[in-house]
Structure formats: C-alpha cells, structure tokens
C-alpha cells in the first residue's frame, strides 16, 4: 500500500505582491541585520561545537558585494524605483561600493584631463609669445643696421619697444625721416655745412590723372600749312557747300596759315598744324568741288 502512494513535491512561485509585502513589512536595514545575525549565530555555534574560541570581529561581520547584489536584485524584482540613496518609502537604499568606486574614478579622470589640457594651452601660449618677441627683436636689429649703414648720428624719433609699423617691416623710412636724411646729406655735401634744404612735396594721386593739354597748348604758337590740291596752281576755290573739318586747337593759340598749291588732278585739301614748342600735329580735311 505504501508503494502505491506517489511522492509529490509542490513548490509555489511567489509573485510581485508577496515581495512587496515582505519589503514593506521589513525594511532593508532590519532585514540585513537579521540576516547577518543569523549567519553569525550559525558560525559561532559551529565553531563552539568544534571547541574553538570565537573572536569579537567574527561576531560583527561587514557587508560584501554578494549581499549588495542580492538586495539589488530583490529591489529590481519588486519594482520599487526611488531616488539615489533613499527608497520610495523613505528608508535608506544600499548601493554597490564597486559602482561608487567607478564613479569616483571617472570624476578623477575628468579633472586630470582638464588639468593636462590647460597646461598644454599655457605651454603653447608661452611658446608663441617667445617667437613673437624673437621676431620683434630681429626686426629691430635689422632696422638699426639699416640706419647705421646710412651714417646717421641720431636715432629715429620713435620708441624702440613699440610694435613694428609698415615702415619698419618694409625697411623704408617714413616721410619725415626721409626729409631729415635728405637735409643731413645736403649739409654733409656742402662746404660750409649750411645749405638751404630742398622742399619736398608729396605727389597727389588726383593730379596724375588730370588732363593738362590745355595748359600745355595755352602759351604755344602754332603754324598752319594748308595743302590745296586743285586745278589752278595759284589759287584755290572752295564752294559754298564744301565740308570743312577745323583743326582742334585752343582758342588762345595764335595760328599762321599758309596755302601751298601743288599739281592738279587732286580735289582734296589737307590742313596740318605744326607747333613750334610742342610736338602736336593736327589735321583738317576739306572736301571741295571744282567750280564750273
């Protein structure tokens, strides 16, 4: 009859409600203390049965990583999400020390990276400033050598420590320095040492593009020679309907006209103007018809 009985083992799987009820009734701290007290009592009883003494540090054991993992899995299974450090009901929440150590290492790495970058930036800034000062000293040295080669007794009237201007970079003196150099050269060349300096005037850009043809031809006296190609060798007859192109001369210019008769068979009159003082040549063409 006993053999006819079947042996059965029943296991009931707990659900979330059971875990929530268990966690609400017993908070983490009390549950943790009870768990370690039971483990400590079991160890003390085992060691006492073997006849070994129990030390005080064994009675007060500390938390380890497996305990934290167990509590974290229980909390995740129960679905109780709360802020860091405290649970939803206000009880203290236990954190994994490995995670805290990892966060601390991350912050230390960030701070060290920022310090290294700032030191590299300072080194680059100092290097660029050193190169700038070296370039400035080389430019000033070249400038002083240029001035000494020109046999000048006095230094130029500008501050040596000032930033280089376009005259220092190009190696050319400024306008005032050029005038002073010209005066000194003239005084050195003169026998008495006292010579009136020449007055220099800057050229105007606008005057370079102005037309000066009227000013050049104003005081000139032009001679005009007309070549008359007609049938008559002595006189020239111009009809009333003839087309005349006058020479382009100034109104203030005095012109002497001379008519020269050449061989017949030509009916075109050419007028040229030859200047006395300037190489200006003007041409005028007249078409004439022979009279009947």
From Swiss-Prot:
The sequence motif named PY-motif 2 is recorded at 172-175
Where does it localize? Cell membrane
Which superkingdom heads the taxonomic lineage of this protein's source? Eukaryota
Residue ranges spanning the membrane: these are: 102-122
InterPro entries found in the cross-reference section = Commissureless
Which UniProt keywords are given for this protein, alphabetically ordered? Cell membrane, Membrane, Transmembrane, Transmembrane helix
Q: How does it sit in the membrane?
A: Single-pass membrane protein
Query: Is Membrane among the key words of this record?
Result: yes
Null allele phenotype: RNAi-mediated knockdown results in thinning or even complete loss of commissural axons in embryonic nerve cords.
Any one annotated GO CC term: plasma membrane
Keyword Signal found: no
Motif PY-motif 1, chain ranges: 163-166
- Give the record's GO biological process terms: axon guidance
Per the record, the major location class is membrane
Function (record text): Essential for nerve cord development. Functions downstream of fra to control axon guidance across the central nervous system (CNS) midline.
Q: Which family does it belong to?
A: Belongs to the commissureless family.
The identity of this protein, by name, is: Protein commissureless 2 homolog
Organism from which the protein derives? Aedes aegypti
- The UniProt gene name for this protein comes to comm2
């Amino acid at each position: 009859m006993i053999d006819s009985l079947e042996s059965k083992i029943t296991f009931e799987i707990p659900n979330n409600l059971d875990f929530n009820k268990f966690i609400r009734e017993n908070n983490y701290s009390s549950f943790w203390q009870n768990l370690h007290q039971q483990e400590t009592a079991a160890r003390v009883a085992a060691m006492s049965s073997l006849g070994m003494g129990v030390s005080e540090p064994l009675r007060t054991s500390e938390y380890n990583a497996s305990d934290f993992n167990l509590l974290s899995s229980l909390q995740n299974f129960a679905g109780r999400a709360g802020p860091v450090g405290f649970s939803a009901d206000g009880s203290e929440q236990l954190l994994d020390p490995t995670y805290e150590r990892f966060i601390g290492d991350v912050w230390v790495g960030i701070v060290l990276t920022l310090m290294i970058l700032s030191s590299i930036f300072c080194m680059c800034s100092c290097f660029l400033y050193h190169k700038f000062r070296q370039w400035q000293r080389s430019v000033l040295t070249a400038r002083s050598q240029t001035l000494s080669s020109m046999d000048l007794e006095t230094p130029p009237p500008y501050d040596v420590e000032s930033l280089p201007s376009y005259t220092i970079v190009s190696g050319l003196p400024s306008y005032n320095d050029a005038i002073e150099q010209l005066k000194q050269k003239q005084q050195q060349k003169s026998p008495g040492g006292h010579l009136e300096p020449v007055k220099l005037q800057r050229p105007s850009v606008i005057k370079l593009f102005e037309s000066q043809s009227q000013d050049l031809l104003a005081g000139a006296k032009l001679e005009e020679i007309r070549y008359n190609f007609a049938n008559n060798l002595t006189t020239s007859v111009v009809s009333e309907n003839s087309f005349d192109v006058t020479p382009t001369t100034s109104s203030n210019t005095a012109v002497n006209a001379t008519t020269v008769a050449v061989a017949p068979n030509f009916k075109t009159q050419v007028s040229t103007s030859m200047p006395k003082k300037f190489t200006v040549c003007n041409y005028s063409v007249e078409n004439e018809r022979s009279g009947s």
